[in-house]
Amino acid sequence: MFFVTPAYAEEAPAAATGTDAHAAPAAGEVHTETGVAEGEHARGPFPPFDSTTYASQLLWLVITFSVFYLLMQKVIAPRIGAILDQRHTRLSQDLEEAGRLKAEADAAVQTYEGELAAARAKSNAIGAAARDAAKLKAEEDRRAVEASLSEKIKAAEVRIADIKAKAFADVGTIAEETAAAVVEQLIGGTAAQADVAAAVAAAKKEA
């Protein structure tokens, strides 16, 4: 269905009856160019502001916006919605993945801290055990040295006692011999061995 404006209706008969500008003029016809037709056409209103064309302009405006609305509703809006849904889904997946990775990282950190604490506790226990073992070994070594020294001291005391006893025995014999020699020098004769021994023994008791 076509809508014909009054301006188009006025120009249509002239275009239908007019001759081709490039055709040869008829016999006896003199062709002259004037600016009357162009002047009359130029004196008309600007087409968008021509009140006689408002109806057709409004109709085409409604048609254009209807087509644009249908295009937006059927083609552009669904595509934009699909893109937004896709981006939303992708963003949700990325957030879930980030949360999962963060949870794994937190778990790894907790595991590392637990292992580190266990290693420290084990190291402290090993150090304490080593110190205790060193103390025990030192105590055992000290006791062994003391026992060895005690045995050596006892052996030395026994030896000293033997030496004393032997020395005293030798001193008694020497004293008896000396006393016998002195008596012999004094009286010019020998004294009985029993008397000399008794005299030396009495002297030891008095000493």
Swiss-Prot record:
NCBIfam families noted in UniProt: PRK09174.1
HAMAP family recorded: ATP_synth_b_bprime (MF_01398)
Sequence intervals crossing the membrane: 53-72
Name of the protein: ATP synthase subunit b 2
Matching InterPro entries: ATP_synth_b/b'su_bac/chlpt (IPR002146)
Localization in the cell: Cell inner membrane
Pfam families xref list: ATP-synt_B
GO CC field: plasma membrane; proton-transporting ATP synthase complex
Cystine connections: none
Organism: Rhizobium leguminosarum bv. trifolii (strain WSM2304)
Function: F(1)F(0) ATP synthase produces ATP from ADP in the presence of a proton or sodium gradient. F-type ATPases consist of two structural domains, F(1) containing the extramembraneous catalytic core and F(0) containing the membrane proton channel, linked together by a central stalk and a peripheral stalk. During catalysis, ATP synthesis in the catalytic domain of F(1) is coupled via a rotary mechanism of the central stalk subunits to proton translocation.
Protein's membrane topology: Single-pass membrane protein
Keyword set includes Aminoacyl-tRNA synthetase: no
GO molecular function, one term: proton-transporting ATP synthase activity, rotational mechanism
